[in-house]
Every structure is written in structure tokens, then in C-alpha cells.
Amino acid sequence: MLETKTIIVTGASSGIGEATARRLARAGANVVLFARRAERLAALCAELDSTGKHTLAVAGDVTLAADRERLVRATLEKFGRIDALVNNAGYGQRGPLERIPLEALRANFETNVFSLVALTQLVAPLMRAQGAGRIVNIGSVAGRITRPLSSAYDSTKFALEGITDGLRGELKPFGVQVVLVRPGFIRTEFGQTAESVSAQVYADAGPYASYLDYFETNRAKLRRVAGVPDDIARLVEKALAARRPRRCYNGPLHAKFFLFMKWLLPACFFDWALRMKKAE
């Protein structure tokens, strides 16, 4: 189903993006890898090409218009069309919203939301002209369940939920399908990136310091149930290969459980369950 399809994957140098690129290449797709880390991209591209796959590595920053345009141009020059886009690039940050600088919050939205929209705006007209295409947005369980001390990142994923729903309705008449994939906890470099981005906020946490200590302790426990990147890559492949894809794919199992409980239980229960606690 995916053989010879040309698919762009952003954030392809590690984690979910890398696993997705590998899985799509195995399925016979022409995979275009996009991320900032040029050396990692080149190594992955060379590895996949050595097995007879057709790939293209484009190093760039998704927040830069020139890099987004170069990505689309390079893809068309090599493969002649774009059949699908996997919007995976993004990062998280943690800490009390009161202490997060507005420029840091804007930067998070720039990468996770606005750049995704901007790249989609470049690709959607091409798909409309073809009369077919598919866009898969990588959201998060955090787009449905906001945790205290994670509201900056979680709010970007809430925004993505609305954008995906709107795009789905707008592009469907033109044969373009839009799908959301919601990962739960996944073992990737995502947590390390969030720690780096949030370091200054943690250092100046003030009255929130003890709550952040508990938050980190609890987060470490959740790693025990975390899935692996290929759990999500498998869902992305399903979303791309299905003739009639679902609106949303959730995974792994713990993500489905949390979302079911969110649907089943009253909001006051979640406020209680997710309340901030101090480290002992």
C-alpha cells in the first residue's frame, strides 16, 4: 500500500521520527528525512539506502521558512510528488507556568504548532492538485489530559488537536485525509530535551521547587510503563496505509487506558488525581 509513496517525516533523526522512517522504508516508501542534526540524518539515510531503500535526507530547522521551502523543493526535485506528511518535530518543557518566560512559551508553540501549520500550508496545495494525500500529526495524550507543571507543552498539543480536527474537515473534499496519532509515555530523547529546555525554570522554581521534585520522582516511575518508539511508528504506518484511516490512533496500552478514564470519570476526579504534591 505504501510502496513508491513519497512521505516526508519531520523530526526524523531520533525517537518516533527515526522509528517511523525505518518502518516506512521497509514498507517500500520513498522516505524524506527532515531534522536539524545533519550527521544523524546522513547516517540513517546511508543505512537505509544500503538496503535498497529510496530515501532523501534534508537537514534543516522546521521553524525557518527557508528550510521548510527547501525541504519541499528537494522532495519534488527527487521524487516528483508528495503523497504524505508526518508532522513529528517537536519538544517539551516543564515547570510552573508562572515561572516560564513568555519567549520560551512562544518558542515551544513556534516549533510544535506554528511550524507544523506552515509546513502543512506548503504541502496541502500539492496534495489538492493531486486529488489525494495524507497528513499525520503526532499529538500526545497530553493534548487531552493536562498535568500541573506541564501545561506549557500540554497546551501545544491541545492546540494541535483543534488544528487537526479543522484540517480534516477542510481537506477531506479534496481527497486529502488528516489523522492524529496520540502517543503516551515513550522512551526517547524527548525527556532529556525537556530537561535541558526547562533547566533555568527548575533552577528558579521558588515555592514550586518541592512540587517539581515530586513531579520528577513520579515521572521516573512512569518510565516503567513507557513504550518504545516503534509502538508509535506502527500506528503511523497504519494511519498511512489504511484505505479509510481512523480519525485518531492512540498508543501504547497505557495511553488508551488514561484516555478511557478521562472520558469515563468526572473532571473533578482528574483534578484530584493530578493535583500537585510535595516531595517528602
Per-segment meaning from a language model:
Residues 120, 156:
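Active-site helix of classical SDR
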Residues 96-97, 101-106:
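Substrate-binding pocket helix/loop in short-chain dehydrogenase/reductase
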Residues 172-223:
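C-terminal beta-strand-loop-alpha-helix "lid" module of Rossmann-like NAD(P)-dependent dehydrogenases
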Residues 59-70, 102:
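The beta1-alpha1 cofactor-binding region of Rossmann-like NAD(H)/NADP(H)-dependent oxidoreductases
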Residues 27-44:
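Conserved glycine-rich Rossmann-like NAD(P)H-binding loop of the short-chain dehydrogenase/reductase
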Residues 13-14:
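Conserved glycine-rich cofactor-binding loop
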Residues 140:
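Residue(s) in the substrate-gating loop at a strand-loop-helix junction
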